[in-house]
């Protein structure tokens, strides 16, 4: 039977909230929750609490929202909570060395990749876009570097041909809490075994930009299909047609070659809109014209068939 730990939890988005839920259901004591300041959101730009803050308040947990942990008064606040360990999941703020050293068992992070592959901000999307066959979560002891700390536990899952960032996010949201609770039990009992990362195997998952989501027809169809899956649900792949962006939510690869210029529509029917690429044909199956909802290609063709005639060049 492992011992109960005094835990500070630091996290912000829904992915982090799912880990907080698991801790709330455990025997551990959460002595404080740190999350980013409320941000403007929605059409009215109303200040909105993070998913972690909303969950913490539901459970009457003390919530702290500093803009930085560098000021000494904020570091004194962390120290005053006398935590055994600080659990950090997608918090979004840098932890100074003084904070990393405060808890008796240090600071533990849940990262959405099999480290040292895909250190950085967008590991789920980059793994999909690169065509990786598996990914997972790594529980690590934090140090001052970017996802460079010693690894305490790794759990993996397969990436299927149908996975998007949304579905992979859900898979890792289930794996992460499981791995976290196992690691905390090992830390509490002194059974945790840390393994150093091999820096030679490291690669970095840079933050996504909307510009990257524009489909480049000079790439092979296989790579473009991965791009569509990686950028679903954000920022969503797109192309330009008649001066307007058309988002692509779903696409498949047709293993056929075409002599047409990449970006040229070579066919359109109820199955989808077929576009020539540098190698193979990309079949667009789910699209969203500007100002409209996402729809199946056949529904778009019913209303705008003249825009998707064979020979039309997409930008």
Curated annotation (Swiss-Prot):
Gene3D superfamilies: Formyl transferase, C-terminal domain (3.10.25.10), Formyl transferase, N-terminal domain (3.40.50.170). InterPro entries: Fmt, Formyl_trans_C, Formyl_trans_C_sf, Formyl_transf_N, Formyl_transf_N_sf, Formyl_transferase-like_C_sf, GART_AS, Met-tRNA-FMT_C. One of its GO terms (cellular component) is cytosol. Keywords: Protein biosynthesis, Transferase. CDD domains: FMT_core_Met-tRNA-FMT_N, Met_tRNA_FMT_C. (6S)-5,6,7,8-tetrahydrofolate binds at residues 113-116. Belongs to the Fmt family. This is Methionyl-tRNA formyltransferase. The gene is fmt.
């Amino acid at each position: 039977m492992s011992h109960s730990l005094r835990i500070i939890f630091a996290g912000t988005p829904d992915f982090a909230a799912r880990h907080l839920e698991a801790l709330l259901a455990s025997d551990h004591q959460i002595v404080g929750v740190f999350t980013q300041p409320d941000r403007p959101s929605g059409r009215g730009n109303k200040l909105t609490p993070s998913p972690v803050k909303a969950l913490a308040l539901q459970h009457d947990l003390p919530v702290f929202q500093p803009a930085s942990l560098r000021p000494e008064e904020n570091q004194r606040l962390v120290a005053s909570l006398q935590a055994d360990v600080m659990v950090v999941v997608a918090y979004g703020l840098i932890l100074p060395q003084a904070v990393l050293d405060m808890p008796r068992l240090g600071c533990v992070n849940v990262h959405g990749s099999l480290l040292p592959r895909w250190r950085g901000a967008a590991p789920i999307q980059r793994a999909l876009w690169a065509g990786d066959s598996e990914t997972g979560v790594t529980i690590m002891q934090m140090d001052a570097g970017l996802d460079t700390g010693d690894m305490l536990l790794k759990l993996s899952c397969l990436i299927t041909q149908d996975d998007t960032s949304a579905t992979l996010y859900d898979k890792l949201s289930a794996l992460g809490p499981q791995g976290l609770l196992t690691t905390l039990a090992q830390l509490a009992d002194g059974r945790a075994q840390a393994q150093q990362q091999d820096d030679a195997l490291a690669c970095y998952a840079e933050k996504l930009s909307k510009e990257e989501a524009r489909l480049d027809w000079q790439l092979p169809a296989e790579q473009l299909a991965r791009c569509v899956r990686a950028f679903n649900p954000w920022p969503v792949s797109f192309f330009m047609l008649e001066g307007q962006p058309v988002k692509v939510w779903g696409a498949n690869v047709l293993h056929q070659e075409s002599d047409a210029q990449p970006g040229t529509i070579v066919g359109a029917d109820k199955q989808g809109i077929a576009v020539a690429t540098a190698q193979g044909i990309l079949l667009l199956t789910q699209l969203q014209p500007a100002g409209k909802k996402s729809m199946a290609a056949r529904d778009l063709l019913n209303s705008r068939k003249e825009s998707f005639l064979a020979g039309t060049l997409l930008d």
